[in-house]
Amino acid sequence: MAKISFNDISFTYEGSEAETIKGFQLAIEDGEILSLLGKSGSGKTTLLKIMAGLLSPQKGRLCFDNEDVTQLTAKKRDIAQVFQFPVLYDSMNVEDNVKFPLRIKKLPEIEVLKRFERVCSLLELDPILKSKSKDLSLYQRQIVSIARAFVRPNLKAVFLDEPLTALSPKLKWQLRKKIKTLQREDRVTMVFVTHDQTEALSFADRVGIIDAGTLVQLDEPKTIYERPLTTFVGDFIGNPGMNFLPVEAFFSKHDSRKKASKVGFRAEWAELAEVGEGRLSGKVVGFEADRTRDHQPYGTTYIHSNFGQMRVRGAYQRLVGKTVSVRLTSHLFFDSNDTLINEDG
């Protein structure tokens, strides 16, 4: 286990004039699961490679437990990596693949067997131990690569780069559960890179939102969702993202809330009402169902108002083309810099 600290780290790829990572500061707690979440090209995989020793920053220090490891090679960092597409030895069977990291450490056979049996039991690998890696499904190959990661002795951290992307939703859920069981057993520090919000918010102890090589918010998943620090985070997180309307949609120009520029609210913080029963109003222009609830279509109603489009979550109602009011149960204020301010504006 290790506490991992980024201290003012910057990185630029050769041939590029723009910094990919810019003065990055982050402390990852010993034994926690941290998800780095961001759009493609935001810099999250670059950060993972810096932690793993695959890239060296031009500026700053990376520390494991206050020890500067910035210039240490990957082999000397006592870490393991799991990638989107598993890297296995196809000529070996599953048992030999899992034992390989232990054999190259020249551990006593009794120690090899002990660690091997433990990880195989937790990941339920027994039925495929004698199978050749080349004959496995993608899901099975990924489980084996995870076993290879966690079987290592003196493991300080595990880094996962989009390990579930190519799997079906059901298999993703199964594999997330297995990974979390292993991590909780070992209390190993884990960093999980993804662009999938569901993975990040359901899997991690904390989530770091990365945008253009900077950390824009670091919080527990519930806080990330309910109190985004910027309109970028509010829009990026959630399906659909947060609604944003100018503050004038709610209050007169002479209202005391002069600092507020925008009002933000989640689609589930709003409900449809009869005209005149809500502060907002607009014309229903569409409905998109994504599930059923109580045998009724449930999804997002799209409403066009004079101040912009609104999205409201709820059961289907035959309202397309009609004017409705929207009533809010909660909302947030943002300033002219798109930054969250207090509820009083």
Describe the residue ranges of each PLM region.
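Conserved beta-strand
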Residues: F6-I9, E17-E29, G60
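The feature captures the beta-strand-to-loop junction immediately N-terminal to the Walker
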Residues: L37-K39
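Conserved Walker
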Residues: T45-T46
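Helix-to-loop junction immediately C-terminal to a conserved catalytic motif
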Residues: A52
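Conserved coupling/switch loops of ABC nucleotide-binding domains, chiefly the family-specific signature
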Residues: Q58-R61, A212
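ABC ATPase nucleotide-binding domains
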Residues: D78, L88-L229
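Non-catalytic connector elements of ABC transporters
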Residues: K253-G345
